[in-house]
Amino acid sequence: MIGIVSIVLPTHKRPNFLRKAIESALFQNYKDIELLIINDASSDETSEIIAQYAKTDGRITEIKNEKQLGLARSLNRGIQQAKGLYIARLDDDDFWSDARKLEKQVKFLETHPEYILVGAGQIRIDEKGNERIRYLFPETDEQIRKVILLNNPFAHTSVLFRKNAWKNAGGYDENLDFSEDWDLWMRFGKIGKLYNLQEYVVTYLQSNQNRSNFNVQANARLNLNLRRKYQKDYPHFWKGFLIGLGAYVLSLPIVYLLRSRLLQNLSYWKISRR
């Protein structure tokens, strides 16, 4: 067994961020790892950057897609080749800000065999590195189940989960362009327990180029369908549906335009009163 923890890091044309993500994985106190970097058909210097690190650290493997497969397919491909008992997620524009992140999560899963997934808190920064917000997610399995239809209760790049749970749940749904993680967590909840450490372990870059911000309307529509799909498995469906419906309405072009105009007018009003 090479690496009790397999870190799966998909990347596509983000060489400027990739180095920091790689280094945050390699600098973990927990050393029994393998780092699988799935290069999703990048045509830039991504492969060269990976090769530089792989020269000095044999725990790194590049998995190169000949054509772009997208996030869900890339994740499944990486996990299929993973040799570890546990899978950790990391994105190319995020980094782990706690060197003991894996150590803490492995210890939790090793001592709580009934749990299959453990996440943690997240810090969001802008492209200049300024902190925008930090937050913790619901902690216990009971708390998570109460809110899982309201919003995604895990930061994707904070999680550690059992590989056999991923296999038993059927992996990431490759038909989803958004929220593939949220969908998987809801399937995980049907076969085991879920938990969030109350600590900040990952720093997430929030930019206008993030996948989940690229098509807000499509994402909102998909999230409504996810809530319908799992309404019999978790409580508070109607509350979650109304939250999702509100998000969908706000994503409509005319509403988005009116909201932008309103915010712009409020800004002018505040300036004029100074």
What does each of the following model-derived ranges do?
Residues 232-274:
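Membrane-proximal basic amphipathic "stem/tether" segments
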Residues 200-207, 213-238:
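Catalytic core of nucleotide-sugar-dependent glycosyltransferases
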Residues 1-216, 270-273:
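Nucleotide-sugar donor-binding/catalytic module of glycosyltransferases
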Residues 165-174, 205-208, 225-227, 242-254:
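Short secondary-structure transition/capping segments
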